[in-house]
Design a protein with these regions (language model features):
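Zn2+-dependent metallopeptidase catalytic domains
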Residues: 17-248
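Bacterial Sec-dependent N-terminal signal peptides
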Residues: 1-22
Length: 248
């Protein structure tokens, strides 16, 4: 009897874990027209697990590229690198679009939390010496005429090679360590700066008491300013913020 109960409990836990995985919409391709995000299924609690799983997935994909015993080629190095990070790309595309256009306190807090984590992940890729050597090898192959690439393939190779060089892949270990510290600090300060600007923009109010000062403005702009003033408890006046009016 005890064995049966243990088995049932184990099955329940496994099913719950599987259900939890299936419930996160970022873990699989969006099953929508054109692959657009299905915002009816996306919730705040989905983002952080998706970021972490995306990092884990891409780390494994990068390791597979580096551990490949075959000589570096465009397909097994550049294409493989370009295709890595599917989950991370999906969650990043949605998350950062929202933090730029429709953020809130919860998204802002998560953005601050994930910034140094994502910065470290990026450095782990572009400062990975074994991966850089493979990319540089393919770049050298094309430079010496050993391989012929299409215009699109050349562009992709050039993009990644320059990304590694410009990210510090050629620096010595000491300078790379310092670069990691700088990148981590910049990721945090950059978000703090953006938040300060957003807060100042949201707080700004220009209250207009004399309608003559609105001369020349379209009626729909005046109406919008009057509505904003009313909502702010300043009925009978006009309020101009830094938000955009919807054009009807």
């Amino acid at each position: 009897m005890k064995r049966l109960l243990f088995t049932l409990a184990t099955c329940c836990v496994m099913c719950a874990c599987e259900q939890k995985t299936e419930m996160n919409p970022f873990f699989t391709e969006f099953q929508t027209e054109y692959g657009a995000p299905d915002f009816t299924k996306i919730r705040l609690e989905h983002y952080e697990p998706a970021f972490l799983k995306g990092i884990e997935e891409q780390n494994a994909e990068i390791k597979a590229i580096v551990d490949n015993p075959e000589e570096p080629t465009f397909e097994n190095t550049i294409v493989a690198l370009d295709k890595s990070g599917g989950i991370l790309a999906r969650v990043s595309g949605v998350f950062f679009a929202l933090t730029e256009a429709d953020t809130n306190d919860s998204l802002t807090a998560l953005n601050e939390k994930m910034a140094p984590v994502l910065s470290e992940h990026s450095d782990n890729i572009y400062l990975n010496q074994d991966l850089y050597k493979r990319v540089a090898d393919v770049h050298q192959q094309e430079k010496e005429g050993k391989i012929t690439l299409t215009t699109e393939q050349h562009r992709l190779l050039d993009k990644y090679y320059k990304a590694f060089v410009r990210s510090g892949a050629g620096l010595d270990a000491g300078k790379q360590s310092r670069l990691r510290e700088i990148n981590k600090e910049l990721s945090t300060l950059g978000i703090a700066f953006d938040n300060h600007i957003l807060n100042e923009n949201n707080a700004y109010q220009l209250v207009i008491e004399n309608e003559a000062d609105l001369a020349g403005l379209p009626e729909w702009v005046k109406a919008g300013a009057a509505e904003e003033a009313k909502a702010a408890g300043k009925e009978g006046k006009w309020l101009q913020s830094l938000a955009f009016f919807a054009i009807c």
